[in-house]
């Protein structure tokens, strides 16, 4: 029985490799060509320079709405616990102070915060369009309007989605709705689902090119799973190997955040390359089929 199962699994692996080896080779070539480790380093640098202004601006916009102002603390805890492993408490403490200070800033200083936040969004936009090989770039006015919508409507949508998630969690957590421990399963899956949804939106909305949902979903699932695994591995490393604290002392938070941002961008770009590889490979297959059909028609005409 075990022998038959092993033979069956081996045949499935061989069949999977035979069916997808060309796609895997194409994906590998794209990864090498795009040099994602270099691009991730560039985005990490821009992110560290612009992330604090971006978060300060978005949280400031969110606090302008009474409903989201009440949810701000729970929203911050959700983001830091699920997207900044191990160092979330320290980061939250600093950013809370930054947001409080932002309310005392002048209009000129706040405008510079907006410009720094726009720099990060613009860098992400340019990087994704380069990966998708977009030739028709958006007009400057269109790009600025889109970036402005991200800064203003983005916090509202994030707040609404987390409020909805909190409502669903409260419903599922009620004993009468808890069937076969589904509430615990839902709570465990919520960070992964949130990551996948965020990646889907990123891969579809950012490139100035039509991206089929099924390809964005495939890339988002891989990126989401890698992101969750990376969070657990990163938290394990920080708790089990605290040697970085001995080396850096009070500055230990800085390399931790930089390393995590770099790993996060590697994962984001990997998911993007999976999405674009699936999209481009399907186009190449369609071209090959059409060329084969044309060659067959020519052979029939000659014969």
Swiss-Prot record:
Broad class of where this protein is predominantly found: membrane
Topology relative to the membrane: Multi-pass membrane protein
InterPro entries for this protein: UPF0761_bac, Virul_fac_BrkB
One annotated Gene Ontology cellular component of this protein: plasma membrane
Origin superkingdom: Bacteria
Keywords: Cell inner membrane, Cell membrane, Membrane, Transmembrane, Transmembrane helix
TM helices/strands, residue ranges: 48-68, 105-125, 144-164, 186-206, 210-230, 254-274
Compartments reported by the entry: Cell inner membrane
Protein family per UniProt: Belongs to the UPF0761 family.
Protein name: UPF0761 membrane protein CPS_0609
Protein species of origin: Colwellia psychrerythraea (strain 34H / ATCC BAA-681) (Vibrio psychroerythus)
């Amino acid at each position: 029985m075990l022998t038959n199962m092993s033979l069956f699994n081996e045949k499935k692996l061989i069949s999977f490799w035979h069916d997808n080896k060309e796609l895997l080779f194409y994906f590998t070539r794209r990864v090498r060509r795009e040099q994602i480790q270099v691009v991730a380093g560039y985005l990490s640098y821009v992110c560290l320079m612009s992330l604090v202004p971006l978060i300060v601006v978005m949280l400031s916009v969110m606090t302008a709405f009474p409903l989201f102002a009440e949810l701000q603390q729970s929203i911050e805890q959700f983001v830091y616990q699920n997207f900044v492993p191990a160092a979330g408490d320290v980061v939250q403490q600093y950013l809370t102070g930054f947001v409080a200070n932002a309310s005392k800033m002048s209009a000129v200083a706040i405008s510079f915060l907006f410009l720094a936040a726009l720099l990060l969004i613009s860098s992400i936009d340019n990087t994704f369009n380069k990966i998708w090989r977009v030739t028709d770039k958006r007009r400057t006015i269109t790009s600025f309007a889109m970036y402005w919508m991200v800064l203003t409507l983005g916090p509202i949508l994030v707040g609404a989605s987390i409020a909805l998630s909190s409502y669903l969690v409260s419903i599922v957590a009620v004993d009468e709705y808890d069937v076969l421990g589904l509430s615990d399963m839902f709570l465990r899956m919520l960070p992964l689902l949130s990551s996948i949804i965020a990646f889907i939106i990123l891969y579809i909305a950012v490139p100035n090119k039509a991206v089929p949902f099924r390809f964005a979903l495939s890339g988002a699932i891989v990126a989401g799973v890698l992101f969750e695994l990376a969070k657990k591995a990163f938290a394990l490393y920080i708790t089990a190997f605290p040697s970085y604290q001995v080396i850096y002392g009070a500055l230990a938070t800085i390399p931790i955040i930089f390393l995590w941002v770099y790993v996060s961008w590697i994962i984001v770009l990997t998911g993007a390359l999976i999405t674009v590889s699936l999209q481009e490979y399907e186009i190449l297959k369609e071209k090959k089929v059409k060329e084969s059909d044309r060659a067959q028609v020519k052979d029939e005409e000659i014969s």
